């Protein structure tokens, strides 16, 4: 890709207590034509000389106290959205400790221009990686797949690409620590924003001793964010079953049982999950595919309820079966990737 094109791409580097190699990383990125935004996340004063080496080559953001990677990323997105709209069309976030190869950063920059969605650089986690990194990665990958129905081999990677038009959306996503990056993926999944993966090198220098990731504290924070999403899902499912049971208990005609219960299920899943759990932002326009898949799930589940009704079978059991089918369909739609199409 030519330098002129990369000049329209910003590399956002959140930095806390940088390594002496940091200026070399900045120089290499600059030589490739990137716009560089550095956010000093409250580093200790003794690291100021390292920042002094790069200040004339970058847009530099700083504040007094360490507030976390998520906060630093959002400050960077805010700065780009407010000041660089004419200069930047796309943004690549990368770690400042050398974990991301410069060539991989450039490859993400190329791909995000083709997809115009989110690009996630994914490491090969089957390789030998430090234990404290594997703990968070494996747990996050498993829980994310169970809850969203989408398998991402590496959802903890900090190497990502975004269209600059998403800066306001990115600033509104909750989280100031490491959980922020996972919240971005969960919210993108719920709102139908496509996520494309690209293989990148797995680099852990000095057994990842320079990382500021705290295995227990940060893993709990990250998984808590995921589980909150799962709890909301469970609430909607429980509400659906309770609605069916109450209607059946009061002997309301079965026509109302399956129509009302299906309304609760599908509308709840497509409205409550998205508005209640993520209703903190100026929302993006949701894909038409999102509504089409909702209608398909509604029709299939309603047919199941009709079958149980006409056969005289226990209607609450039919509700469980319909719920199971809806969950499976949601999983299949998520794995197919069609939810991200506009």
Per-region residue spans from a language model:
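Hydrophobic helical membrane-anchoring modules
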Residues: 2-9, 13, 20, 28, ...
